Amino acid sequence: MQCPKCQTDSFVMRTIRGISVERCTQCTGLWFDARELSTLLNEDPRFLTPLRGEAGAEEFNRKRGRCPRDATPLLRMYSAINPAVIVDTCLQCQGIWLDGGEFDALLEQVQRRDK
């Protein structure tokens, strides 16, 4: 698996409620396979602490990349949850890449919405 933003192959896996998410150790981005992100955003936020992180370097956030699963070019699109966040989506496998810090922004928006 290669990071779509910084091209490293150094990932750590975090398993939350049976869902495994890969985090790039260099740029702190997160890879979610199909439907994993929406499932996790509906979980109790206390379980999601291992996925929270600092914002990545801006140079990585603007970069277009390829899907780490199938090398399809990722499509950048505004998140329906928080339009201030641009997510990178693979149209082939439906996976989603979030740059460092974007998971936090989405989670905070979900928490505000659910109050």
Residue locations for each model-derived region?
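Terminal recognition/anchoring or ligand-binding modules at protein termini
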Residues: 92, 99, 103-114
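Cys/His-rich microdomains that often coordinate metals
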Residues: 9-11, 31, 71-74, 97
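Residues immediately within or flanking Cys/His clusters that coordinate Zn2+
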Residues: 1, 21, 29, 64, ...
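Short, solvent-exposed interaction modules
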Residues: 52-96
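Short cysteine-rich clusters marking metal-coordination/redox-active sites
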Residues: 3-6, 24-27, 67-70, 90
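Short, intrinsically disordered terminal segments enriched in charged and Pro/Gly residues
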Residues: 36-58, 107-115
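Short, structured motif recognition centered on aromatic/hydrophobic residues
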Residues: 30-32, 37, 96-98, 103
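Short, recurring structural edge motifs at helix starts
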Residues: 9-13, 17-25, 74-79, 85-87
